[in-house]
Amino acid sequence: MTRILGIDPGSQRTGVGVIDVDEYGCSHHVYHAPLVLLGQSSFAGRLKQLLLGLSAVIEEYSPKEVAIEKVFMSKNADSALKLGQARGVAISAVVLRDLPVHEYAARQIKLAVVGRGGADKQQIQHMVGVMLNLQGRLQSDAADALAVAITHAHVSATAQRLGVSTKQAWSRK
């Protein structure tokens, strides 16, 4: 089995999701949760809380690979910068443990999980629940993190079958 950690970075909440992928390519739910960062009085405190929270998840679940959502351009420059900083902290927590990081754009994730690059949050939550046989409504950030992990599982399986890298497996060339 391959264990994958999916991360949906955020400066207020960061979603984390862990799945196992068996030898047949089936994904199995292990863990998901939002890391809520709003309890800190400063932004630096939130980043520290994010680093410690992700480190604890990595320590407890021992993923072999990590997939993270890429930053999208926002109309609010301050929000985009904070998101980029949170994403940098998340990647740092991963690379400090010598784990491979795979990055996917939001449209790629939506296409892989829902079949439509313009899917909305509810569609992602629903499909992640169906794919992982989960009951009840998933919290949005955690569902997004599981979706990133599922996307990587699918792209990785395709890359392995084709004998190419995950970047090449996603490419249309």
UniProtKB/Swiss-Prot annotation:
It is found in: Cytoplasm. It catalyses: Endonucleolytic cleavage at a junction such as a reciprocal single-stranded crossover between two homologous DNA duplexes (Holliday junction). Coiled coil: none annotated. Mg(2+) 2 binds at residue 69. Its EC number is 3.1.21.10. Its main location: cytoplasm. Binds 2 Mg(2+) ion per subunit. The active site is at residues 8, 69, 141. GO terms for biological process: DNA recombination; DNA repair. The keyword rRNA processing does not apply. One of its GO terms (cellular component) is Holliday junction resolvase complex. This is Crossover junction endodeoxyribonuclease RuvC. The gene is ruvC.
